[in-house]
Amino acid sequence: MDHIYDVIILGAGPAGLSAGLYAGRSRLDTLIIEKGQAGGQIINTDEIENYPGQIVEGETGVSLVRRMYEQTEQFGAEHVRDTITDVELNGEIKVLTGEKDTYQAKNIIIATGAYARPIGCKGEGQFRGKGVSYCATCDA
């Protein structure tokens, strides 16, 4: 807990990885904390055609996230997998307590993303991906 980062980014989806890339490029001592697998919702995407940046033909969510993750590492960002259970944002040094460790930083970026929220109607789970979707443009 003695290490004080310039910035800690909560979340390793596209927004968190982008923030980590730019923080690293700016030579900030950067830590990205993700509670699960890096990538967020985009890892469930089979084909990406309309994402800003250098997309290769047949790009999947997994391949894009892998490249983004590697870029953050190339610019010096560290990654840990932990679930943050408490935050103390008062004062110059912010303290984040996780299930595995405690982290300190001068700045925090919250990029925890979103998730599909089922409404709980009859047949919703049964027909997910078969007419029930959480992506309007996917069904267009």
Predicted feature residues:
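FAD-binding core/adjacent interface of flavoenzyme oxidoreductases
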Residues: 1-10, 79-140
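N-terminal Rossmann-like FAD-binding beta1-loop-alpha1 element of flavoenzymes
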Residues: 4-31
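Conserved Rossmann-like nucleotide-cofactor binding loop
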Residues: 15, 37-38, 115
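Short amphipathic alpha-helical segments
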Residues: 20-21, 44, 120-123
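Glycine-rich, phosphate-binding/catalytic loops in enzymes
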Residues: 26, 48-49, 124-128
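Short beta-strand "acidic-cap" motif of Rossmann-like dinucleotide-binding folds
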Residues: 29-35, 42
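Short, acidic/turn-prone active-site loops that include or flank metal/cofactor-
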Residues: 37-38, 56, 137-138
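N-terminal Rossmann-like dinucleotide/flavin-binding domain of flavoprotein oxidoreductases
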Residues: 43-102
